[in-house]
Amino acid sequence: MARSVKKGPFIDDHLMKKITKLNSENQKKPFKTWSRRSTIFPDMVGHTVMVHNGKQFTPVYINENMIGHKLGEFSPTRTFRGHVAGDKKAAKK
């Protein structure tokens, strides 16, 4: 279910403070965050955010196409190791 329009998009306060501070100082250095639930705002474009995936921090460079999405969408939490190629048991009938 989508978030209500009257509530507006969500972003953690500490994350917004970091972005406004970096924008006021004209810095583009990467910074770490655990806030995967925060929505990407237009103020964040051009920054590199290190998003935690439960094990390590994944660098995410924010561009215009990411606005409105969540930070967690760009930092996968699970590793896909592939399917077994030689499994013939399921194919028999």
UniProtKB/Swiss-Prot annotation:
One Pfam family of this chain: Ribosomal_S19
GO molecular function per UniProt: rRNA binding; structural constituent of ribosome
UniProt keywords, alphabetically: Ribonucleoprotein, Ribosomal protein, RNA-binding, rRNA-binding
GTP-binding found in the keyword field: no
Record's GO cellular component terms: cytoplasm; small ribosomal subunit
Signal peptide per UniProt: none
InterPro entries reported for this sequence: Ribosomal_uS19, Ribosomal_uS19_bac-type, Ribosomal_uS19_CS, Ribosomal_uS19_SF
One Gene Ontology biological process: ribosomal small subunit assembly
Keyword flag Amino-acid biosynthesis: no
PANTHER family per the UniProt record, alphabetical: RIBOSOMAL PROTEIN S19P FAMILY MEMBER (PTHR11880), SMALL RIBOSOMAL SUBUNIT PROTEIN US19M (PTHR11880:SF8)
UniProt similarity note: Belongs to the universal ribosomal protein uS19 family.
Function: Protein S19 forms a complex with S13 that binds strongly to the 16S ribosomal RNA.
Protein known as: Small ribosomal subunit protein uS19
